[in-house]
């Protein structure tokens, strides 16, 4: 069931969307292509046994990204055993799989494209879907967006995005919710690296298509995931993004930025 939403956003004292319930994150059994879909989620929020801010500060380093050096993030590195923790160890400390601790290739490519083409977001209301570390949301704010709402189902990402936003001198609002299917008052929707699961992609494609048909710009960064609907989108740019072999099957991923068109002819149409 999707979380309720009211528009405009009711902001909390820190600028976050305070009325939305928290929803737990998917499991991270291995590499990015193996991440399961939102359909597998339990209905209750895992009990947070560890203070998120203290944990993030103790288990990450502040790094500039190789493909987006303008932005610094709190990220896991080989110096921290966050790379090595099993699912059981993460559960023991009350930590959902830490997608927010890594700069995925799709997000890096999309962030690069936004910074290189600020006219796409300048003065506009932006939603960064499945925000993770907040990389793409931060890039949109740096490029001049009027406002950015970062959305993710993992409650830990709220703290990660706040810390990363502060590092970069921008303010990003946050909502912990599954918003797939919602129609919101946003001009631009951004999504980095979201087509890793078939069931998830099957939910996203009609939603993204409907948003584009209503006039929103829908941009996706994808490093060649198995369920990316390439035949349904327009290619905008391609990058060679440095990544870590611990997460991917190579040290560089060819990453493409795509846009869902407002209208895409069906097979046999004129």
Which residues does each PLM region occupy?
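S-adenosylmethionine-dependent methyltransferases
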Residues: 2-9, 20-22, 34-270
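Glycine-biased, low-complexity coil/linker segments
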Residues: 13-14, 30-31
């Amino acid at each position: 069931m999707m979380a309720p939403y009211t528009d405009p956003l009711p902001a909390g004292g820190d600028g976050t969307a305070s009325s939305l319930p928290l929803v737990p994150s998917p499991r991270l059994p291995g590499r990015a292509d193996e991440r399961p879909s939102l359909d597998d989620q339990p209905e209750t929020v895992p009990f947070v046994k560890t203070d998120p801010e203290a944990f993030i500060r103790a288990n990450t380093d502040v790094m500039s990204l190789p493909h987006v050096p303008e932005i610094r993030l709190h990220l896991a590195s080989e110096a921290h055993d966050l790379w090595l923790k099993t699912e059981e160890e993460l559960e023991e400390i009350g930590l959902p799989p830490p997608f927010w601790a890594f700069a995925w290739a799709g997000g890096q490519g999309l962030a690069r494209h936004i910074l290189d083409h600020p006219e796409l977001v300048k003065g506009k209301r932006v939603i960064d879907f499945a925000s993770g570390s907040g990389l793409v949301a931060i890039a949109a704010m740096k490029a001049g967006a009027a406002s950015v709402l970062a959305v993710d189902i993992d409650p830990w990402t709220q703290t990660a995005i706040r810390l990363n936003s502060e590092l970069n001198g921008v303010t990003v609002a946050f909502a912990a919710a599954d918003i797939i299917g919602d129609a919101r008052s946003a001009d631009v929707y951004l999504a980095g690296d979201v087509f890793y699961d078939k069931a998830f992609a099957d939910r996203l494609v009609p939603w993204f298509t409907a948003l584009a048909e209503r006039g929103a710009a829908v941009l996706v960064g994808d490093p060649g995931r198995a369920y990316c609907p390439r035949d349904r989108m327009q290619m905008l740019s391609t990058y060679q993004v440095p990544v870590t072999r611990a997460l991917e099957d190579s040290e560089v991923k060819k990453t493409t930025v795509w846009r869902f068109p407002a209208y895409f002819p069906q097979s046999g149409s004129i």
